[in-house]
Design a protein with these regions (language model features):
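Long, continuous compositionally biased terminal/linker segments
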Residues: 82, 296-327
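Accessory beta->alpha helical hairpin/"wing" motif in late/C-terminal subdomains of nucleic-acid enzymes
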Residues: 64-89, 104, 118-159
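An N-terminal amphipathic alpha-helical segment
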Residues: 227-263, 270-272
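Short, Lys/Arg-enriched N-terminal segments with co-localized hydrophobic residues
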Residues: 1-29
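Short, amphipathic alpha-helical interface elements at domain boundaries
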Residues: 23-102, 106
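Amphipathic alpha-helical segments
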Residues: 110, 266-284
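Short hydrophobic helical membrane-anchoring segments positioned at the boundary
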Residues: 140, 144, 149, 153-238
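Short, well-structured beta-strand/strand-turn elements
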Residues: 115-124, 281-291
Length: 327
């Protein structure tokens, strides 16, 4: 039994190392800001502004300042690194809306030209409140293979033993400051993330300065309101995995689909919802995770619940799709 466990552990480490190598090889032509944008823009509204997208674009502006410095040799002085880091933080904090718009156009154009990002119908357009409103809703969708390669490569780098490159620490920091870290790491993994970065900070003052730097307080008022409003939902299987040790933004929306399906069980309702979404042009997969079945739409996973809403005092039956945050 011990030999089997040891073999499994070795295989896991080899797989993790392969993921690191795949990411380094496959993403060598992408800058830090582009790798970050592929992860963070995925699923965000492309036409209309939002607080979550603003956080992403501010982080992109910071990444552009930092990416040259992070790619330099370790011999560079701490004072130079610290100066660039402070410049990056200030850039993110003071970015104007017009500058945000310009950054979005630039980064989207580059990634779209490489077929790594595209605009698709936003699933929010299937929600009862938007379906017949006439409002056009579009969202960014990252290339699945590239998205997974960057995501799993970073997860392997951070969660497994061994040195963390300064560039990967920078990518993790950008995800933390823009509220994206919950998309990549579960609650239990976030404890490991904190532990690993604390270790790195003790050993190298550059990592310490990076991990202590913050620009998310620009959104602090919004996040505090969100926490007060949503905390009660954590008693239900909605928005699971929110760890308030790290900044959190409401990046993904739940969707209520109006459909009356009498005399059916949960599986029937799920099948009807899948059929409806496919007719709307969405690529939907049913993914079995433990005892439940999730819907994978694009790069995002959803739980599905039967639900009744009231509009103009009339009860309306349907299903609610709720983003799944991993525990």
């Amino acid at each position: 039994d011990l030999k089997w466990r040891d073999a499994l552990l070795v295989a896991h480490r080899v797989n993790s190392n392969n993921k690191r190598k795949e990411r380094k090889t496959g993403m060598k032509d992408l800058t830090l800001s582009q790798q970050y944008a592929l992860l963070a823009l995925d699923g965000q509204e492309s036409i209309h502004p939002s607080v979550a997208k603003s956080a992403v674009l501010r982080a992109v502006s910071a990444a552009r300042v930092l990416e040259t410095e992070l790619g330099k040799a370790d011999a560079d002085s701490f004072s130079e690194f610290s100066a660039e880091l402070q410049k990056a933080v200030q850039m993110a904090k003071t970015l104007k809306k017009k500058e945000e718009t310009q950054i979005e156009k630039e980064v989207a154009a580059v990634l779209e030209a490489e077929e790594l990002l595209k605009e698709v119908p936003d699933i929010l357009g299937c929600d009862m409140n938007y379906d017949t409103s006439g409002v056009e809703l579009k969202a960014y969708l990252s290339d699945e293979a590239s998205y997974i390669r960057i995501k799993e490569g970073l997860r392997a780098e951070i969660l497994e033993d061994g040195p963390i490159s300064l560039e990967d620490a920078g990518l993790l920091w950008l995800l933390r400051e823009s509220g994206c870290i919950h998309d990549l790491f579960s609650v239990s993994e976030q404890n490991r993330v904190e532990e690993r970065m604390t270790e790195a900070a003790v050993q190298d003052e550059k990592y310490r300065a990076l991990w202590e730097a913050e620009f998310h307080n620009v959104f602090e008022g919004f996040m505090n309101r969100f926490v007060k409003t949503k905390s009660k939902l954590l008693k239900n299987p909605y928005l699971e995995g929110v760890n308030l040790v790290f900044p959190y933004l409401d990046r993904r929306k739940s969707v209520f689909i109006d459909m009356v399906i009498f005399g059916t069980n949960v599986a029937d309702r799920r099948a009807a919802a899948v059929e409806y979404l496919k007719k709307k042009g969405f690529a939907v997969e049913e993914i079995r995770v433990g005892s439940e079945t999730l819907l994978k739409i694009g790069n995002i996973y959803y739980r599905i619940f039967p639900m009744t809403k009231t509009a103009y005092k009339v009860p309306i039956q349907g299903v609610n799709l709720v983003p799944a945050y991993w525990q």
